[in-house]
From Swiss-Prot:
It is an enzyme of class 2 (transferase). Keywords: Amino-acid biosynthesis, Aromatic amino acid biosynthesis, Cytoplasm, Transferase. Its main location: cytoplasm. GO terms for molecular function: 3-phosphoshikimate 1-carboxyvinyltransferase activity. PANTHER family: AROM/DEHYDROQUINATE SYNTHASE, PENTAFUNCTIONAL AROM POLYPEPTIDE. It comes from the Bacteria. It comes from Legionella pneumophila (strain Lens). Belongs to the EPSP synthase family. One of its GO terms (cellular component) is cytoplasm. Catalyzes the transfer of the enolpyruvyl moiety of phosphoenolpyruvate (PEP) to the 5-hydroxyl of shikimate-3-phosphate (S3P) to produce enolpyruvyl shikimate-3-phosphate and inorganic phosphate. Its EC number is 2.5.1.19. It catalyses: 3-phosphoshikimate + phosphoenolpyruvate = 5-O-(1-carboxyvinyl)-3-phosphoshikimate + phosphate. This is 3-phosphoshikimate 1-carboxyvinyltransferase.
Length: 433
């Protein structure tokens, strides 16, 4: 078992970059694989989750070179060129891989099966199997959870699906199926979710219409190979945005961070709490907006986090809770029940961990209350969740004594270089088994 010890530090200073965006990296492989022609992707995240997606397409006959220095070269086989995999596709810890692949595989002529690790096998999949079945797909789960068994050769028909809650994974799953369905597939969102798939469709020259919260796609298009630069992942940058905000005298610059407006909830929330975050040198990598982020220490105050921010910061809440633990006053969050269905029950994991470190925190069914103050040293269990592990590593920098975090191996799913990057800013994080 891999564990971290994070020791208190004086201040954090320096300039870093973070690895490529995980959501965009997954999608670059998917669309590159079914494109006509070759795609060159730079800035690819070579974490275990994205490698699971890459290996899935290699098992379906797609030639992919790399990753080599964050570059992958994908020799696309076209929309109808995938071949039946010889084995069950193992998605590891990656819910994104499983849910997006399910949409694509539901439209193929061959049978397939998707499985994953112990954590992934507990995650809900009816949210994709039900709408796929409405389209005519033959998709079965085990009591609503993986593994997923897909019978190929089914004729799919477009549907108009109104999303019951914000979920970029469900939306993307149905858009991928819609690329093969008879007639139009329409997806209406009542709350904003990540729009990387819609942007990626445009990058690969596939026709998609978006109007008044409804996305429309049909099968009358092809993806075409392209060149793509992937920006740094704001979900990875989040750890250092919070760290610089809560560690006195800190001054940190993070370059080349994706600032897609469906992902910048963390910046809005921390700014509302009083953080000093400056967005510099705004530009674009293809369809995705990018900037450099300059963060300096500022005393934070507790707030009631608006429900509208939940889908815009869903992956960043664990480290936002660390910021709340250091703020003056109470912070509350509601409307975030989805946090209980992630790689772990993130509300439960954070409440337990914060209480272990002397912070008063209470969990609700759909949120949390945190009374800010100071963080003590101690030991917490990440429950095998990469974002919980990294969040408590950040807490160690401002704790009164070292913080030990157990069960951190899954940090490699999203941020393999986390400890190295953190220590460049003068963190003191050590790994041990």
């Amino acid at each position: 078992m891999l564990n971290f010890i994070s020791k208190p530090v004086g201040c954090l200073k320096g300039e870093i970059t973070v690895p490529g965006d995980k959501s965009i990296s997954h999608r670059s492989i998917i669309f590159g694989a079914i494109a006509i022609g070759t795609s060159v992707i730079d800035g690819f995240l070579d974490g275990e989750d994205c490698i699971a997606t890459l290996k899935a397409f290699q098992s379906m006959g797609v030639r992919i070179e790399g990753p080599d220095k964050q570059r992958v070269i994908i020799h696309g086989v076209g929309k109808y060129g995938l071949k039946q995999p010889q084995n069950i596709i193992d998605c590891g810890n990656s819910g994104t891989s499983m849910r997006l692949l399910a949409g694509l595989l539901a439209a193929q002529q061959f049978d397939s099966q998707l499985t994953g690790d112990e954590s992934l096998l507990k995650r809900p999949m009816l949210r994709i199997s039900r709408p796929l079945s409405q389209m005519g797909a033959d998709v079965t789960t085990q009591d609503g959870k993986p593994p997923i068994v897909i019978k190929g050769g089914k004729k799919l028909n477009g549907v108009h699906y109104v999303m019951p809650e914000a979920s970029a994974q469900v939306k993307s799953c149905l858009l991928l199926a819609g690329m093969y369905a008879e007639g139009q597939t329409k997806i209406t969102e009542n709350a904003v979710s990540r729009d990387h798939t819609e942007r990626m469709l445009r990058t690969f020259s596939y026709p998609v219409q978006i109007q008044d919260g409804t996305i429309v796609i049909d099968r009358n298009g092809e993806c075409h190979g392209t060149r793509l630069n992937i920006p740094g992942d704001i979900s990875s940058a989040a750890f250092f945005i919070v760290a610089a905000s809560i560690t006195p005298d800190s001054d940190v610059l993070i370059r080349n961070v994706g600032i897609n407006p469906t992902r910048t909830g963390i910046i809005h929330i921390l700014t509302e709490m009083g953080a000093d975050i400056r967005i510099l040198n705004q530009r674009a990598y293809g369809e995705e907006p990018v900037a450099d982020l300059h963060i300096r220490y500022s005393q934070l105050k507790g707030i009631d986090i608006p429900v509208s921010m939940v889908p815009l910061a869903i992956d960043e809440f664990p480290v936002i809770f660390i910021a709340a633990a250091c703020a003056q006053g109470k912070t509350t969050l509601h409307g975030a029940k989805e946090l209980r269905l992630k790689e772990s029950d993130r509300i439960g994991a954070m409440v337990d961990g914060l209480n272990q470190l002397g912070v008063h925190a209470e969990g609700f069914d759909d949120g949390i209350l945190i009374e800010g103050g100071s963080i003590q040293g101690g030991e917490v269990n990440s429950r095998g969740d990469h974002r919980i592990a990294m969040s408590f590593a950040i807490a160690g920098a401002v704790a009164s004594a070292p913080v030990t975090i157990k069960n951190c191996a899954n940090v490699a799913t999203s941020f393999p270089s986390f400890v190295t990057t953190a220590n460049m800013l003068h963190f003191q994080i050590e790994e041990y088994s």
